[in-house]
Structures are given as structure tokens and as C-alpha cells.
């Protein structure tokens, strides 16, 4: 894994740490003393995302190579049908009703039905009001808040929030009061154990949203700019069961962000 840029991180329910890089997928022990690289059943390309759903299924998406499910018994991966024209699913999410969603690179948002036959596996999602949700959009990350049950979509065009419906339509929510206080160039969103949203950005560290207060706060992480001389460029963010925020920075790699002290403990330390 050394010298490989990290694209996605997952701490699974069995205690393993999954790491996706630009060229491979790894499963590591909790202390990183051992790591296994998966090659035989997976394409050699960039890992877009790694996700574990409520049924403990682990889903991995690959750049232009589709979506795969991990088979724990065989310790291998199962490939799913191609999605859209480009077969480039970027993010996977399961909501509180166990509905799966897939955000693609350039082909919009889909509902995902893993148990259905080929033609029914993916269903494109559109907004009730035409054009409010881009059909050709790129969605990097998906999360659901605990207060309203809305889906939060991090895209190449900014942040979208939608209300689910029983059909393949969604209603977009006006969040101008939130987005006006945030940098609009985001990379990923996660939820902490208190129900707060954390959004990683390319230019300004991470943003924190507490919907109960409500509070919107930016954490610019000046130590990164001081060390690299460049913008923060947080490419991945993950909240573990201990409440720690794990980040991946373009130059410095993997680190744990401590909100209370505003400090980052880098993996190399």
C-alpha cells in the first residue's frame, strides 16, 4: 500500500479496515499489522468507494468497471451487471428503509435493487421538478440525516438535499441557508454517532453541520496548508465507531482529525 494514493476507507462490522487505492483494494487488520490485497476477482483500476450496508454486505465500486459485492464465505467478490453506458458507479448508500442508492460519474442517481434480474437492478432517479437534480450529474457521496431523513448528495455541482418518494422521483430541498456558508467544492460526506454531518472539501478542510442546533462550522485545518503550502484537498472522510474522523489528504495521506484540539494525527506518526 506504500506510495499508493488512498481513494476510500471502510471500517467494517468485523473489525477489518478496507482501503481502496488508485490501483487496488486491501483488507487490513485493525492495527494494520497485516493487509491482504485482492487481485484475482477484481479489476485493476481505481477504487471509487467501499460501503457496508445494514445486512453487512460490503460493496465496492471501481472506475469504469462497475460494482462488486464481497462474499465473506469464499473471500472473493461477485460482479453485478453494468450500470448505464459508462458502468461507472461512484458511491453506494443504503437508507433507513434498506433501499440502496448509487451515485454515478456523469450519469446521475440510481436506485439499486441487488436481488432483482439484470434489467431491474438499476432504476434512474429524477427530480419532481425537471432539471433540479442533474440527470447527467456526478455524485461523489451520499448520506442520510437522522433529523429529517433527507438524502444529502455531494456532487460535482455542489451539495443537493432530496426527500425520498416511493417512486423513482425525489423532491429537492432548498438548502441555500446552509450552502451559502460552505465551500461548494466537496468530495465526501459522512455522519457521526451524534447525527452530525461532516463534509470534506477540496479547498477548505471539512465542514460540520448540526441540524438540531442548528450549527454550521468550517474547520479549515491550517496545519495542512502550513506543511504542504497548498490547499487542504481532503479527498476522503470517514467517521468510526469511536467518533474519530479519519481523513485522507492528497499529499500527507491518512490521518485522524481531533475536533476538540483541531489537530491531525497522521498515520505515518
Give residue spans per PLM region.
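Carboxylate-rich, polar loop motifs that coordinate divalent cations or form catalytic acidic clusters
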Residues: 1-269
